[in-house]
Amino acid sequence: MTWLMLLSACLLTCLGQIAQKYAVEGWRETFPGVLAALRSMWLWLAIACLGLGLLVWLLVLQRMDVGIAYPMLGLNFVLITLVGRYVFKEPVDPQHWLGIALILVGVFQLGRQA
């Protein structure tokens, strides 16, 4: 159950980051103003996902050592890189992919230890 909560915290955090990206996509040229920004569905989705992710994360910390749990959030870097590359068409250079591979190795090692 704890691993499922950890995965949920990761996914909610990633969804929050993706929603933030969508929220600011239209703000590249000029900021629309606070009231217009607050009407963004994407911004509210980001706040909801990040808030819920925080609550789930607190439950994870009750049940798992922080030295194991926190590095597992490294999966967020992997997921966000994939979304950036394939959804937002952002370039990812070979060094970045190497870093992602190293993160995956580290998460795998810690997962075996837990």
Curated annotation (Swiss-Prot):
Main localisation: membrane
GO molecular function, one term: carbohydrate derivative transmembrane transporter activity
GO biological process: lipid A biosynthetic process; lipopolysaccharide biosynthetic process
Record localization: Cell inner membrane
Pathway terms, separated by semicolons: Bacterial outer membrane biogenesis; lipopolysaccharide biosynthesis
Stretches of the chain forming a coiled coil according to its record: none
NCBIfam families recorded: PRK15051.1 (NF011625)
Stated role: Translocates 4-amino-4-deoxy-L-arabinose-phosphoundecaprenol (alpha-L-Ara4N-phosphoundecaprenol) from the cytoplasmic to the periplasmic side of the inner membrane.
Family to which the UniProt record says this protein belongs: Belongs to the ArnE family.
Protein name: Probable 4-amino-4-deoxy-L-arabinose-phosphoundecaprenol flippase subunit ArnE
Species for this entry: Pseudomonas savastanoi pv. phaseolicola (strain 1448A / Race 6) (Pseudomonas syringae pv. phaseolicola (strain 1448A / Race 6))
Upper classification of the organism: Bacteria, Pseudomonadati, Pseudomonadota, Gammaproteobacteria, Pseudomonadales
